């Protein structure tokens, strides 16, 4: 797909929803292990690339070649899309190359015409992109060579034209932006990628708001309030893990 066909491309605005807000539901690698009944999840780059390529279309010609199969799925215009509370999916570890948990949310996504197969394809795509997270350090020739892996030229062009020297994890953001435009947004959903630095910023904002809500003024009272906040958020307070934030529009 030629980047010139996408005239409305712009760098996605930062997410305005704080991932530490009380109405946000959190999903971690431990939830994935519980759902799959597995103690160990294979998160190697080989597995990520294999699934990412398998879920793409190569038998047809034209603009659909190399794109996820879900993109050819027609949107149901008459469907009534039910809003749902934001879902925050934590990366499997503090190393983003290990990807994100593969968990489907039928009570929310099915009502937006997003099947388990669609969601699985998306996570596999993101995880494949996570395997290439070091691409930001590559030269232009190496980036363009990624097309040989079956990656859409759309994503590579998006990186070259929109993210060079402007954002971290450009390939991951390019993949997610492609899915948002081609699949999620028409189905009244949107996914944000929030890196660990952005998580740390949101955490600081959340702690400050909590301190202000408690009416703290002195250093000692602020310290106690911060400790209370950490205790309340102990399972999700890590700033080392990146996040995917899934919201309804």
From Swiss-Prot:
Output this protein's name: Uncharacterized protein C1198.03c
Q: Does the keyword Nucleus apply?
A: yes
**InterPro entries cross-referenced by the UniProt entry:** DUF4646 (IPR028018)
Q: Which Pfam families match?
A: DUF4646
Does Cytoplasm count among this protein's keywords? Answer: yes
Q: Which UniProt keywords apply?
A: Cytoplasm, Nucleus
Q: Where in the cell is it found?
A: Cytoplasm; Nucleus
* First-listed, main subcellular location of the protein, grouped into a coarse class: cytoplasm
Would you tell me the Gene Ontology cellular component terms?
cell division site; cell tip; cytosol; nucleus
């Amino acid at each position: 797909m030629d980047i010139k066909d996408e005239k409305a491309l712009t760098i996605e605005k930062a997410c305005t929803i704080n991932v530490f807000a009380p109405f946000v539901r959190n999903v971690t690698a431990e939830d994935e292990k519980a759902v799959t009944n597995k103690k160990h999840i294979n998160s190697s780059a080989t597995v990520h690339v294999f699934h990412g390529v398998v879920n793409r279309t190569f038998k047809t010609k034209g603009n659909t070649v190399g794109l996820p199969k879900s993109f050819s799925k027609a949107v149901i215009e008459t469907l009534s899309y039910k809003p749902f509370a934001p879902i925050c999916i934590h990366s499997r570890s503090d190393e983003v190359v290990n990807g994100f948990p593969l968990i489907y949310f039928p009570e929310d996504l099915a009502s937006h015409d997003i099947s388990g197969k669609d969601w699985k394809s998306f996570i596999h795509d993101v995880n494949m992109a996570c395997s290439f997270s070091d691409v930001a350090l590559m030269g232009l020739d190496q980036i363009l060579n990624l097309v040989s892996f079956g990656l859409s030229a759309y994503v590579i062009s998006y990186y070259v034209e929109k993210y060079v020297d402007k954002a971290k994890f450009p390939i991951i953001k390019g993949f997610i932006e492609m899915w948002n435009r081609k699949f999620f947004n028409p189905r009244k959903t949107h996914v944000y990628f929030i890196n660990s630095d952005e998580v740390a910023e949101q955490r600081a904002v959340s702690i400050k708001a909590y301190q202000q809500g408690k009416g703290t003024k002195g250093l000692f009272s602020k310290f106690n309030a911060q400790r209370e906040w950490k205790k309340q958020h102990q399972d999700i307070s890590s700033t080392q893990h990146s996040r995917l934030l899934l919201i309804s529009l």
